[in-house]
Swiss-Prot record:
It comes from Prochlorococcus marinus (strain MIT 9312). It holds the Pfam family Ribosomal_L12_N. GO terms for cellular component: cytosolic large ribosomal subunit. Keywords: Ribonucleoprotein, Ribosomal protein. This is Large ribosomal subunit protein bL12. Forms part of the ribosomal stalk which helps the ribosome interact with GTP-bound translation factors. Is thus essential for accurate translation. The lineage of its organism: Bacteria, Bacillati, Cyanobacteriota, Cyanophyceae, Synechococcales.
Length: 131
């Protein structure tokens, strides 16, 4: 790997979740591409190799996204603490994430972890869906 690409990679590793999201939007605009389109293709590919067709119905989803849909205004600080703890975001980034609900808190996590995080956020006063 060249020194330039290593430097870029290290810079990307230090981005917060919100900064990474902003970067994706800027890249999409600058190059006229869509990150969502390629993700849809990747998600469709496993079903394409399903074989006889009814194998897909028996498959259970293994990765989930935890989405904060809304929260009780009186419980905002509690929800913020849970989200901050779960994501490792700084206070400002976690606050921005919570205030911009509905927003994905964590992506591609195991079912047990997703259900545990959902329970924590709901106990703190948030409304959560798993996708």
């Amino acid at each position: 790997m060249s020194a330039k690409t290593e430097e870029i990679l290290e810079s990307l590793k230090s981005l917060s979740l919100l900064e990474a999201s902003e970067l994706v939007k800027q890249i999409e605009e600058a190059f006229g591409v869509s990150a969502a389109a390629s993700a849809g293709v990747v998600m469709a590919a496993p079903g394409a190799t399903g074989g006889d067709g009814d194998g897909g119905a028996a498959e259970e989803k293994t990765e989930f996204d935890v989405v904060l849909e809304s929260f009780d205004a009186a419980a905002k600080i509690k929800v913020l603490k849970v989200v901050r703890n779960a994501t490792g975001l700084g206070l400002g980034d976690a606050k921005a994430l919570v205030e911009s609900a509905p927003k994905t808190v964590k992506e591609g996590i195991a079912k047990a972890d997703a259900e545990s995080l959902k329970k924590e956020i709901e106990e703190a006063g948030g409304k959560v869906t798993l996708k």
